[in-house]
Swiss-Prot record:
It comes from the Eukaryota. This is NADH dehydrogenase [ubiquinone] 1 alpha subcomplex subunit 13. The gene is ndufa13. It is found in: Mitochondrion inner membrane. The chain crosses the membrane at residues 31-51. Accessory subunit of the mitochondrial membrane respiratory chain NADH dehydrogenase (Complex I), that is believed not to be involved in catalysis. Complex I functions in the transfer of electrons from NADH to the respiratory chain. The immediate electron acceptor for the enzyme is believed to be ubiquinone. Its main location: mitochondrion. InterPro entries: GRIM-19. Belongs to the complex I NDUFA13 subunit family. It is a single-pass membrane protein.
């Protein structure tokens, strides 16, 4: 059996001592209000620009869709009339059934133009 003794050594502070701790209250330098105002204003300006540019495109697409539907609606109405007249139907004076009304859609589309 090998017998050895480990010498116990206490840890000591470095020569000259530890550096002083800074424990005083410190705060970051305040941001001037003008910088905050400019930042918020620029973000709002960019957001407003994006919103209104998208609104212009969206309105153009809706206008094109309305024009397209107003051009094709007479054809759809004629097809609906042909299907109605070709089908055997009861006398309109003794029934409450009515054909689908595309006239209301046409009036609504033409009113919006």
């Amino acid at each position: 059996m090998v017998g050895y003794r480990q010498k116990w050594v206490q840890d000591l502070p470095p020569a000259g001592g530890f550096p002083k701790l800074k424990y005083a209250r410190t705060s970051t330098s305040p941001i001037p209000g003008a910088y905050i105002f400019a930042g918020v204003f620029s973000i709002m300006a960019v957001g407003t620009y994006i919103f209104f540019s998208d609104k212009v495109e969206r309105n153009a697409r809706e206008e094109e869709e309305k024009r397209r539907l107003s051009m094709i609606l007479p054809i759809l109405q004629a097809e609906n009339d042909i299907n109605f007249l070709a089908s055997p139907h009861q006398n309109v004076y003794f029934t409450r059934w009515m054909p689908p009304q595309t006239g209301k859609r046409a009036a609504a589309l033409l009113r919006d133009l």
